[in-house]
Amino acid sequence: MESLQIYLIWSVYGVAIAILIAVASTFICAYQTPRDRSPSVTLICIISITVLLATVLLLPVDIALVSSITSSALGRRKSWATQAEVDKITFSLTIVYYSLYTVDALLCLIGIPFTYFWYEEYDEVAAEAGQQTAGQRFWAAFKYTLFFVAILIVLFLVGFFIPTSRNLAGHDSDFLRRLFTEDRGQHALTFSVGILTTLGLSLYIIYTSSGLARLPVLLMKTAPSFSSPSLIASTAMQLDSNRERQRQLDGRCGGDTALLSSKDRRELDSLVREERTLTRRQRLAEGAQEERRSWPIKVYHKMEAVLHPFKLLAGFVLLLAALFLWTSLCVTAIDKLMNSPCKHRCGYILERVNIFNPVNWVLIQSSRVFPVDYVIFTLIVLFLFCSSVVGIAAFGIRFLWIQIFSIRKGRTSPQALLLLTSMLMLITLALNYSVAVILAPQYATFGPQTFCDMPPVSSGPQPDCSRARNLIKSCSEKAENIGANGLCTPSVASTLLNQMTSNFPFFGAVFFWAQFIFLGLYLLVLVVSVTRSPRLDEHQLDEDAEEAEEERLLARTGRRINTA
């Protein structure tokens, strides 16, 4: 029976990975530009996003497996759950976790950079002329990637030799003591993942918090369309005004711009550039309006009008869900701040949950019927992931407040797609910590596990609470009953994350206080998004018009070449 249960749990995880592959593939194909696609870029992006999300979504499997050894109704271990079987389950989970974390680090620091340089090194003219071979391209990309290989090696070496914190005097317990029992290889990997998570937290704070606030509002508030009659009329008026001013300046100089003052010449040059922009904008808007008259577009807009109330409802539901998540994050953060026994010395670990956490309670109750908790947990993770994408799309990829790439559906370049994937990988690592340690700490540690709060009998049977159900209590990090320490099995994920924050208190302090910045920034962006009406991005519209004009010129040139 136990083998069948374990097999079913892993089967659900396999189905989840298949869904993740479909989600990642759809996401990448939807955002990449059709005219500049690279198979290597597409493949590495899909693999990276799938592996990262698979790492996060392993947590419910972890909870289900460690919880399967006990009966939550009786607070005792099942007959087959010997210590050897328990060790076998936790060891297999540990292997899977460390394998996934290793692949995550390799993809983030080596796989994506190499693919970026591999794409940049491609010279279409040289390749067609036979002057650039695959080996030359590989070596050129590898030389640039060596810098990231060096970073990875340095991280592992520092993590291998750096000492761990032992400053827990007066706060020792079996649970905390177990956090320090790891070998140096695990120590190095934990440190490396901690560094990447720290980098991801800065992105998580900026992009995920803003996206979490903006996503529901975007569904409830729709920006005006660039093909609307009012915009076309406004553009036509601006164009007429522009040309009238140009005629005035031409009349002033009789067609000879050399007779104009320097101020008037600058104004005329500016008017000419503005005229080109307005002409492209008008042509794009009129083309879009013409497309609206075709029957497929008419059907699409009618369906959009019919589904508009459901879109509003979805936005309202997502807003409630976001506030629900925000409340749970805030509650646990305050609980840890007030009740953690060792504070920053162990990463603000809680011995038990002291304040009611709604998300934590929902996940614990649903975990009694697997895979209900898996579905809820997956929806939460995908919601936060999509919020991160919305946040990045809103701000773009920036360096020192300078936008390098824009992220838009169907118009994202391969370079931007690789940078987007690396940012999402770092954000997902930070999300992994926030969900497991802050959003649902009790669920992520022990799940629905319980124990019978009776004094254990030495070398005798387990305590029986079948006639005293009031003595069946939920497992926690520190239970007063001695027998609970041997009965309650923490999840492997919580052990690894708590090892990270306990062995390296710097990580614990940064991870914890970053949550308050996240919560504050979410409220700020939410207030701004709700109070401000959506506007049409004219800069983005002008970029679309310029790209459309380039595509027309390329298509026209291609037809001339084919005709010749």
Curated annotation (Swiss-Prot):
Keywords: Cobalamin, Cobalt, Lysosome, Membrane, Transmembrane, Transmembrane helix, Transport. The keyword S-adenosyl-L-methionine does not apply. It comes from the Eukaryota. GO terms for cellular component: vacuolar membrane. The chain crosses the membrane at residues 8-28, 41-61, 94-114, 144-164, 188-208, 312-332, 375-395, 418-438, 506-526. Disulfide bonds: none annotated. One of its GO terms (molecular function) is cobalamin binding. It is a multi-pass membrane protein. The keyword DNA-binding does not apply. It is found in: Lysosome membrane. It holds the Pfam family LMBR1. InterPro entries: LMBD1_LysCbl_Transport, LMBR1-like_membr_prot. GO terms for biological process: protein localization to vacuole. Belongs to the LIMR family. LMBRD1 subfamily. Probable lysosomal cobalamin transporter. Required to export cobalamin from lysosomes allowing its conversion to cofactors. This is Probable lysosomal cobalamin transporter.
